[in-house]
């Protein structure tokens, strides 16, 4: 058993090889910080939600979120404000959130603390992430991205925009799904640890 050997570092307080790996990952993904997660992207998604929501807070999200999001809401007592994506009846799949739907949800729930976006959905559908990030930030809300199926967005050409490139505050990236790593390995990406608490207003 080598789990307590100092050269292997400590995931909860990295100071050597794990810290270096996280710094390299942050650089590769264009994030300010990257945290290695070994509980799958479920743990990354739950960490995102639990870090910005407390009991009674509202969070805007698509109806087709992963169950890890719902589990996080149960744990913290936050209130979901659902956006119902349209359905492609020919293929039988749900689509992404439309800008107009998100704008309506923000207008009707200005007290929401965050907007969560699937980037992409399980079926590869992407919402207009840049526009949604801007709407969320203009309203003083965080924008969180579940990128369980979007690892390749950071490294391929002619790919949809990644969460970090779009300016999302946090993203959960499932390295083992489309990144080629071992099962349950995931990254929690953070663009910035500082966020304003009031909506930005033009002067």
What are these regions (language model features)?
Residues 56-117:
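PLP-dependent aminotransferase-like
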Residues 165, 186-192:
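Short beta-strand-to-turn element immediately C-terminal to the catalytic PLP-Schiff-base lysine
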Residues 33-56, 71-72:
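Conserved beta-loop-alpha segment that forms the PLP phosphate-binding cup at the N-terminus of a helix
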Residues 91-152:
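Active-site phosphate-binding strand-loop segment of PLP-dependent enzymes
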């Amino acid at each position: 058993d080598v789990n307590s050997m100092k050269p292997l570092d400590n995931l909860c307080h990295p100071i050597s090889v794990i810290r270096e790996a996280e710094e390299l990952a942050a650089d590769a993904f264009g994030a300010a910080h990257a945290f290695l997660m070994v509980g799958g992207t479920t743990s990354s998604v739950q960490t995102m939600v639990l870090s910005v929501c407390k009991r009674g807070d509202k969070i805007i999200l698509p109806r087709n979120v992963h169950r890890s999001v719902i589990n996080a809401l149960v744990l913290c007592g936050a209130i979901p404000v659902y956006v119902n994506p349209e359905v492609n009846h020919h293929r039988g799949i749900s689509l992404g959130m439309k800008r107009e739907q998100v704008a309506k949800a923000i207008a009707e729930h200005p007290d929401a603390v965050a907007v969560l976006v699937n980037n992409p959905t399980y079926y590869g559908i992407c919402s207009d992430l840049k526009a949604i990030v801007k709407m969320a930030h203009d309203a003083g809300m965080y924008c969180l991205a579940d990128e369980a199926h979007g690892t390749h967005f950071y490294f391929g050409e002619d790919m949809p925009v990644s969460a970090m490139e779009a300016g999302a505050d946090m993203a959960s990236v499932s390295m083992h799904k489309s990144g080629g790593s071992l099962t349950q390995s995931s990254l929690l990406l953070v663009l910035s640890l500082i966020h304003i608490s009031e909506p930005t207003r033009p002067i």
